[in-house]
């Protein structure tokens, strides 16, 4: 089966005025080897690849080791979305973003400002300030945030044209742990929203796309799968399926059973004598 995450021409993903061919964004860390990373990217055909300037290789053969990784990114020819992973202060975020812009020659930045090292939860108290400063400096900011409605609204208020709420803490693979909040957030905000972090299964991605989310960003679920390449394809298909289902319009849930086959009359053998 050939997997392609291309989207219909009449239903593009648009972020900061730029149109993308896919609604899947893919991280580049923790893959067993550069070859598997490359194959997974080719299978998933993502809109963008996220990469951190604060990489530290676990082993010489890791997918993120040395200059070879940067050469691989260039060879893949997929737009790179630099991130500020590992930053714990607004000052760190600004410095890292500026270095990323110079290195990759791009105004795009995935804003990550961590407030707790155990859960990797965003620092919601300083996130809006960081986003505001980056936007004033000319960045196109995609902020990693929680599903908190007020926080996301504040990010939009300071100029973020898209937000990226988590489904669950980074790397947990638990899927949407607060469906109510995520669905409410989708209902209340009109800007593009991509679920970032915590997705573990293609069904998780399909679910949030069915709710009307505009895309997903994932990494660990593919990188740590037994077969990363096949899993990348499965997620690409799931994102497409979820988007198609959302556009098709799901039936309303019912509290009681409804016969799928209409009964227009009573069979003759049921008539009383």
From Swiss-Prot:
Naming one, the record's GO cellular component terms include: cytoplasm
Q: Which domain of life is it from?
A: Bacteria
SUPFAM superfamilies, per the entry: ThiG-like
Q: Name one Pfam family in it.
A: ThiG
- Coarsely, its chief localization is cytoplasm
Task: From the Swiss-Prot or TrEMBL record, state where the protein is found.
Answer: Cytoplasm
Report which reactions are catalysed by this protein: [ThiS sulfur-carrier protein]-C-terminal-Gly-aminoethanethioate + 2-iminoacetate + 1-deoxy-D-xylulose 5-phosphate = [ThiS sulfur-carrier protein]-C-terminal Gly-Gly + 2-[(2R,5Z)-2-carboxy-4-methylthiazol-5(2H)-ylidene]ethyl phosphate + 2 H2O + H(+)
Please list the residues that make up the active site. 110
Write out the GO biological process terms. thiamine diphosphate biosynthetic process
Keyword Transcription regulation in record: no
Do you know which HAMAP family this protein is assigned to?
ThiG
UniProt subunit comment: Homotetramer. Forms heterodimers with either ThiH or ThiS.
**Similarity remark:** Belongs to the ThiG family.
**Function statement:** Catalyzes the rearrangement of 1-deoxy-D-xylulose 5-phosphate (DXP) to produce the thiazole phosphate moiety of thiamine. Sulfur is provided by the thiocarboxylate moiety of the carrier protein ThiS. In vitro, sulfur can be provided by H(2)S.
From the Swiss-Prot or TrEMBL record, give the protein name: Thiazole synthase
Q: Which species is this UniProt entry from? A: Variovorax paradoxus (strain S110)
* Gene that encodes it: thiG
């Amino acid at each position: 089966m050939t997997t392609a995450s291309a989207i219909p021409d009449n239903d593009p993903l648009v972020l900061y005025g730029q149109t993308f061919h896919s609604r899947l964004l893919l991280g580049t860390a923790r893959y067993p080897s550069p070859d598997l990373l490359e194959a997974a990217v080719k299978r998933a055909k993502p809109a963008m690849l996220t990469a951190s300037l604060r990489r530290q290789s676990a082993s010489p053969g890791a997918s993120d080791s040395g200059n070879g990784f940067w050469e691989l990114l260039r060879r893949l020819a997929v737009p790179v979305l630099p991130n500020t992973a590992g930053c714990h202060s607004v000052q760190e975020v600004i410095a890292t973003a500026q270095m990323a812009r110079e290195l990759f020659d791009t105004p795009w930045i995935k804003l990550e400002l961590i407030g707790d090292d155990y859960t990797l939860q965003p620092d919601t108290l300083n996130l809006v300030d960081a986003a505001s400063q980056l936007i004033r400096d000319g960045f196109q900011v995609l902020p990693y945030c929680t599903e908190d409605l007020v926080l996301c609204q504040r990010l939009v208020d300071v100029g973020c044209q898209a937000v990226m709420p988590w489904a669950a803490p980074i790397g947990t693979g638990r899927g949407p742990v607060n469906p109510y909040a995520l669905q409410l957030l989708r209902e209340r905000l009109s800007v593009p929203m991509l679920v970032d972090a915590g997705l573990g299964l293609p069904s998780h991605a399909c679910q949030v796309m069915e709710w009307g989310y505009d895309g997903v960003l994932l990494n660990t679920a593919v990188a740590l799968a037994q077969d990363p390449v096949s899993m990348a394809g499965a997620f690409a298909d799931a994102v497409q399926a979820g988007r198609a289902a959302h556009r098709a319009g799901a039936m309303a849930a019912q509290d009681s059973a409804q016969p799928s086959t209409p009964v227009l009359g009573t069979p003759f053998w049921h008539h009383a004598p």
